[in-house]
Each structure stands twice: as C-alpha cells, then as structure tokens.
Amino acid sequence: MRKLLTGLMTAGLFALAGAAAHAADSKTIAVSIPAADHGWTGGVVYHAQQEAKALEARYPGLKVIVKTSPDGAAQANALEDLTTQGINALVVLPHNSDELTDPIRQVKGKNVFITVVDRALRDPIQDLYVAGNNPGLGTVSAAYVKEKLGGKGDVVVIRGLPIVIDEQRVNAFNEGLKGSEVKVIDSQFGNWSRDDAFKVMQDFLTKHPKIDAVWCQDDDMAVGVLEAIKQAGRSDIKFVLGGAGMKDMVKKVMDGDATIPADVLYPPAMVAVAMDLTAAGLYDKLPVRGSYILDATLVTKDNAKDFYYPDSPF
C-alpha cells in the first residue's frame, strides 16, 4: 500500500478479502499519460507503473496497460488503439485538455469508465476526476511563509505558466498573506523550468538587496533558485518554499536543511490514487464517481519520511 494513501481512504476501500472472488473476473484498465518529459511527469510514470503491478497482484483477473505518449496527437492515437483491446476503464492524464476531450468522449461512448487525472477536460464528461488542490497549495504555502517569517518580511514569487492552475495557486497565496506584513516585492514567470527559474532568480538577486524568502510553488524551479542563490553568495534569504514533492527536496526536509525546511505536496502519485479508485469501482462496485481532490499537505521534518520515494525519478 502506498504511503501516500495512508489516511486518504478508508481501510475498507481496498480490503483484500474479496480479491479471491474476483480471480475469474477478467477486466482491463488502460492508463494513458504523458511521456516522462520532465521531473513531475517522470514521477507520474513511475507511480503508474508501480501501481499497475500492485493492482494486478491485488485483483488476479485484472490487466493494467500503461501507455505513455510524447504529445497530444500521439495520445489521441493511443486512446484509439487502446479501445480496440476491449478495455473496461480508462485512467487518463491529458496532454492538453482541449485536444483530448473529444478523443476521450469517443472512448466513453464505448461504455468505458473514464477517470481523468490532474488536467480537467473542456467538457466534464468523465466519471471520476482526481487532482491535487491548486488553491490549497497556495493557501498552505502562504500560511507557512507567514509563520516562518513571523508575519513580516519581503518575498519574491516565481510563477509557473500563465494558465488557470497557476492563477489559482498565486491568487490563493496572495489572499493568504492578507493581514500580515509579508510583502511580495517581485513576481515573474519561471515556466516551471529550473533553467528559467535560475535566470529569474538571478534577476531578483540583482534588483533586490534584501529578500527574506522565495516562493516558487514547484520543486523543479526551486532547484534553479537554489543554484542562483549559491552562485550569488547571498546569505539574507532565509528559505525557499517549492512544491510538488520532488524526492530531492523531501530529502532536504528530512535532513533538516535550513534553506528547504518544508515542501507542499502536489503529488505525481495522484495517478496511483486514481488507478486504485478505478479498480475499486470495477471490482468492489463502490460508488467512486465524482471528484477526489487530494490535500495540499505541508511536508515537514516530522512527516517527510512518509512522502519520500527514493526510487522515483522525481
């Protein structure tokens, strides 16, 4: 059982008692996800592959097919191919919501249970939606920054891309700072890239002689931020707060690194939650339709070990 699932679902949801009864009940779940083109996606692929093995062991009649695609067009073609294999359910993290909505609709038209992960479709045709909490990531981050700075300080923000989930995170962060004397003195897009974040942080360091903390909402970008701070030799920055749960950052939290004292989860392992729920719906006939939003958990030294996956690429 994945450590991430501890406390997220009732123990009865994945009880093994009925597994033997399902041995002759053959079903197929297809998992369609982007190829590992960056760290977070690499983590998604890792957790999907690990969960596929766990589910096939839990339900002897189950076959799980994990298919990665390099772009939206390839993913649409993959969905068409997967439906020819007689699948009962599809777990899909779309490359692009607009491009994949109609191909997913076609799969659903073949009486296939649809679970969408992370990126919502243009039209909510899915049976189950599993995602991280984007506003929650901003809210939890703001609360931590306020407390860590004692309610007063100068913060720079490195945003992701100019899309909805970035707006949700940043708006919640700004709202969470209200009532304090913590000020956002600069904000730029880092495109969820460690190289771009490195350049943005270099600019911040040149422009601002005093920075108390950095919020960059993403652990890949935090890597670039840390390198920029190191090269500049700056000692005024008290800490950097990223997000997602990259193993390198979680390890720093575990080890008591003063520069990375915490992290906020937006876990790639959400795909495993989606797969678990989908299988439970197929085999245990549990009412799993609807939305399942994972908490934006604050990772500290006290709980970091529960979210550390040393074998994951992310």
Over which residues does each language-model region extend?
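Gram-negative bacterial Sec-dependent N-terminal signal peptides
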Residues: 1-22
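A residue-level marker of the well-folded mature domains of exported/periplasmic proteins
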Residues: 3-4, 21-314
